[in-house]
């Protein structure tokens, strides 16, 4: 451990405590933090990523959570002697002091700007997979999250699709990779197929997203979106992908949508052949309409 000067020791004691009974990182808390770390998409806490900006830190996970007061002093000295500015140091201490339930008092003592408090609160709650609390802090005015890629991936991998949509809509991070486009489109499609479809058309790999969107709504048995698909002015490539997927299974929603699509595209003969070979389709409303349509054209 680096040797502390007297003024540094006073600051340390003023921030934390030298009493063992005050030390919050017991085995239960330590295990919880390590579990949260393993559940992160890249096995890194947001605090790990922040610590990695300090020159010389190669393994942030070995520093947090500290296993003893000596370890905490070592982390304190690394931050104190680091190449980062005072405001960033205060942000690190604010995050650590949340574990000690002293962060609010500290922020008042050093006049830590509110937007930085909310930013660190957001990261703290993301690290603990408390997504609603995290988003409520990260979407406040003047808060500028600086790890949008990790935030998007974290929300998507934890199936927090509404929060992801809110984050993208409010913060407006550049969706400049296919993975980010994919996370957003496949979140959006769960709530608005039409909005997701229009977004998909502007993406770098629209047909790949189109196939993923169709698979998702079919697998989730989203009948309303399937009805909407049939009425869309699809391109030839989109139609080919759609027909291929619909013909891949004999499940009811696949068959219903395929029959409706064949009727809509005026492929009456193929629609009649499909319905005649399916007991399920013979009972459908689309089949009744199909036979009326066929009798009128005969």
UniProtKB/Swiss-Prot annotation:
It is found in: Cytoplasm; Nucleus. InterPro entries: ELYS_dom. Keywords: Cytoplasm, Nucleus. Transmembrane segments: none annotated. Its main location: cytoplasm. One of its GO terms (biological process) is nuclear pore complex assembly. This is Uncharacterized protein ely5. The gene is ely5.
């Amino acid at each position: 451990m680096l040797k502390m000067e007297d003024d540094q020791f006073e600051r340390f004691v003023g921030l934390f405590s030298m009493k063992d009974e005050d030390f919050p990182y017991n085995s239960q808390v330590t295990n919880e933090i390590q579990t949260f770390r393993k559940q992160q998409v890249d096995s890194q806490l947001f605090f790990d990523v922040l610590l990695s900006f300090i020159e010389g830190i190669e393994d942030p996970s070995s520093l947090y959570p500290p296993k003893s007061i000596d370890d905490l002093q070592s982390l304190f000295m690394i931050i104190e002697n680091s190449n980062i500015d005072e405001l960033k140091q205060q942000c690190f201490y604010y995050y650590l002091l949340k574990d000690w339930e002293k962060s609010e008092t500290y922020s008042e003592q050093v006049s830590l700007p509110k937007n930085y408090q909310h930013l660190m609160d957001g990261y703290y709650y993301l690290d603990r997979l408390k997504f609603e609390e995290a988003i409520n802090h990260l979407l406040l005015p003047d808060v500028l999250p600086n790890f949008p890629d990790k935030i998007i991936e974290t929300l998507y991998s934890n199936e927090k699709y509404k929060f992801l949509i809110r984050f993208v809509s409010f913060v407006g991070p550049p969706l400049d990779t296919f993975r980010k486009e994919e996370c957003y489109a496949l979140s959006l499609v769960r709530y608005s197929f039409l909005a997701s479809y229009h977004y998909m058309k502007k993406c770098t790999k629209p047909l790949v997203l189109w196939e993923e969107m169709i698979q998702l709504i079919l697998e989730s048995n989203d009948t309303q979106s399937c009805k909407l698909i049939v009425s869309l002015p699809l391109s030839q490539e989109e139609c080919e992908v759609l027909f291929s997927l619909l013909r891949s299974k004999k499940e009811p929603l696949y068959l219903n949508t395929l029959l409706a699509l064949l009727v809509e595209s005026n492929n009456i003969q193929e629609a009649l052949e499909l319905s005649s070979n399916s007991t399920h389709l013979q009972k459908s409303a689309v089949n009744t309409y199909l036979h009326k349509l066929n009798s009128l054209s005969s």
